[in-house]
Amino acid sequence: MQTAARRSFDYDMPLIQTPTSACQIRQAWAKVADTPDHETAGRLKDEIKVLLKRKNAVLVAHYYVDPLIQDLALETGGCVGDSLEMARFGAEHEAGTLVVAGVRFMGESAKILCPEKTVLMPDLEAECSLDLGCPEEAFSAFCDQHPDRTVAVYANTSAAVKARADWVVTSSVALEIVSYLKSRGEKLIWGPDRHLGDYIRRETGADMLLWQGSCIVHNEFKGQELAALKAEHPDAVVLVHPESPQSVIELGDVVGSTSKLLKAAVSRPEKKFIVATDLGILHEMQKQAPDKEFIAAPTAGNGGSCKSCAFCPWMAMNSLGGIKHALTGGRNEILLDRKLGEAAKLPLQRMLDFAAGLKRGDVFNGMGPA
C-alpha cells in the first residue's frame, strides 16, 4: 500500500471505468438550445411562473445552469446552490413537485430524499461525466475486492452507486467527513473523482483507494497556463474547485465547493479574482459582487481555439423551454425503484445529518459527530 504522500497521478485502480467519450460530449452540445431573445425569454418565464404555482412546484437550480434559469429560480422562491444546498432545500421545501435544473444525479438525489414528491427535470439526458465514468457493476466489483474499507462516494453518482456506499459526500463537506472517518481509524474507498479524492487524501492523510473518474470541465484546467495568468495578475485571488488537477489546486488561494468559492469572492476585500470552475458561477459572483473583476482560468494553452472553455455541456442542456415542457403534463419525471431509493437514502441522509451538525456547531469527535 502506497502512502498518502505519493505523487498525485499514481492511483489505486486499473482503468476499468467507462470514460466519457468525445461522441457523448458532442451529442450533449448538439442538444443545447440557443439562448432565447429577450422577448421570448420573458414570455417563457411568465408562463413558467404560472405553471409553478398551478403545479405546487418549486424550481431548484445549480450555479452552473443558464443565468436565465438561476434568476427565475430566485424570482419564484426557489433555490440556486451547489448540490448539497439543492438537496437540503428540496427535502425541506413544502412543494409537492421539484423541478431540478442541473444534471441527472441531482434529480435522482432529490427523489431519493423525497420519494413522495414528483421530481421533474428539463432534460433527462443531462448527465455527468463523473456519473458516466463510474458504472455500478464495475464500482461494486472494485469495492468487493476491499471489504474492510468504508465506501465514500461523491454525490455525482447514480442512485445505484450511492446504494453501494456507506457515505455520500459533496465537496462542501468532503474534508470534514473524511477527517471524521480517519479519526475513527477507518480506511476508505473513494469514488469517482480522482482529483478531489487525491486532494482530500493529501489534506487529511487518510488511507484512501481512489477510483479514476474525472469531471470533463475541471480536468481541463491547466496549471502552467494558470501560473502564467496569475503572474499577469499578481493582485488576483485564485479560486479553485477541488475537482481540478493537483497542479491547478496548488495555485489556489481558496480551494473549495462552488458555494465556498462564491462566499470568498463576495467576502474577501480583494477586487480581482481568477476562477477555476465552471463559468456558470460567474453570473452569481458578478451579481453579488458587482464591483469586482472575475477572470476565467485557462483550459487551453497557446494555439487553443478557446482559452477558457469551462462549460459543462450537460448543464447547458437545461433551458427555459425544457422547464416549461417538464411542467406541461409532468414530463421528464425521475422515477426510482423503491428499494433502490431506500438503500441510496441511507448514506445520503448520513451526509445531510453530518452537515446539519456542522452547521449547528455540534461538539465533534475528530471532525464529525461522535
Swiss-Prot record:
Binding site for [4Fe-4S] cluster: C128, C215, C312
Pathway annotation from the record: Cofactor biosynthesis; NAD(+) biosynthesis; quinolinate from iminoaspartate: step 1/1
PANTHER family for this protein: QUINOLINATE SYNTHASE, CHLOROPLASTIC, QUINOLINATE SYNTHETASE A
Origin superkingdom: Bacteria
UniProt keyword annotation of Disulfide bond present: no
Protein name, as recorded: Quinolinate synthase
Gene Ontology annotations of biological process type: 'de novo' NAD biosynthetic process from L-aspartate
InterPro entries xref list: NadA, NadA_sf, Quinolinate_synth_A_type1
GO cellular component terms listed in the entry, alphabetical order: cytosol
Cofactor(s) recorded in Swiss-Prot or TrEMBL: [4Fe-4S] cluster
